Amino acid sequence: EIPQNLGSDIPHDIIKLPNGQWCKTPGALCSSRSECCKAKHSDSVTYSSGCSRQWSDQQGLFINQCRTCNVESSMC
C-alpha cells in the first residue's frame, strides 16, 4: 500500500516519456524528477510532483520515491 503522504490520492497523468517508458506513479522508486508522473492540472500552482527522499521502515534506509503534493497544504 502506498502512503497517502506520497500523493497517491491526487489525480495524475500517466504519460509516455521521451525514453519510451511510462512515467512512474506516486510511491514508485525513482532517480530523478523527470521520471515521475505529474498531477493533472499541474499547469496551475496547486500541485507539485517530483522524486523525493523518504525513509523506508521496511528496508531500514532512505529511498527515492515519486511524490505529488498540494503546495497549499502541509504535504509539500
Swiss-Prot record:
Expressed by the venom gland. GO terms for cellular component: extracellular region. Pfam families: Cys_Knot_tox. Disulfide bonds join C23-C37, C30-C51, C36-C66, C69-C76. One of its GO terms (molecular function) is toxin activity. Keywords: Disulfide bond, Ion channel impairing toxin, Knottin, Neurotoxin, Secreted, Toxin. The keyword Disulfide bond applies. It is found in: Secreted. It comes from the Eukaryota. Its main location: secreted. Belongs to the neurotoxin 21 family. The presence of a 'disulfide through disulfide knot' structurally defines this protein as a knottin. Neurotoxin with probable ion channel impairing activity. In vivo, is both paralytic and lethal, when injected into lepidopteran larvae. This is U1-cyrtautoxin-As1d. It comes from Apomastus schlingeri (Trap-door spider).
